[in-house]
Regions:
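Conserved catalytic cores and adjacent C-terminal regulatory segments
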Residues: 1-143
């Protein structure tokens, strides 16, 4: 499906700035694919959108890891940061020098948590390992 939609388009073909989190499993570190919107971001422009999409979506147990050339094997971006909007805001303020004042930057964040993975109220906060055994998995997968 990604191939049909994006073909051979690359990050460099995008008209808007993007920052896409993933984990370079070969290097054991986070990696953020970026458009070349600052002089120091010259490495990722050549990557195909299909490869970047498969890399950032490679959630363990759901989708396979994805290899991009000789650069490495990549895993789900949510492993390095499940709120990419915060990375974008950080980038805007620290790299693009957007002022840190109300209204200077906007972030649209669409949550994915399921109701079953949420906790309300102050009772039962010290669950212990037996309760967390199931709850932790639900929390990590849905947040």
């Amino acid at each position: 499906m990604l191939q049909e939609r994006f073909g051979d388009l690359t990050i460099g073909d995008l008209k808007r700035r993007v920052l896409i989190p993933t984990v370079n499993y070969s290097k054991g570190s986070g990696h953020f694919f970026k458009t070349p919107h600052a002089p120091l971001f010259y490495l990722d422009y050549k990557h195909r959108l299909v490869d970047v999409g498969l890399a950032t979506a490679a959630a363990p147990t759901y989708f396979p890891l994805h290899q991009i050339g000789e650069e490495g094997v990549y895993a789900d971006g949510g492993l390095v940061g499940n709120s990419p909007g915060l990375f974008g805001l950080h980038e805007a303020q620290h790299v693009l020098k957007v002022p840190r004042k109300p209204g200077s930057a906007r972030v649209l964040a669409i949550g994915t948590m399921t109701l079953g993975a949420t906790k309300r109220g102050a009772s039962g906060l010290d669950w212990g390992i037996l309760h967390w055994r199931k709850a932790l998995s639900d929390l990590v997968i849905s947040s």
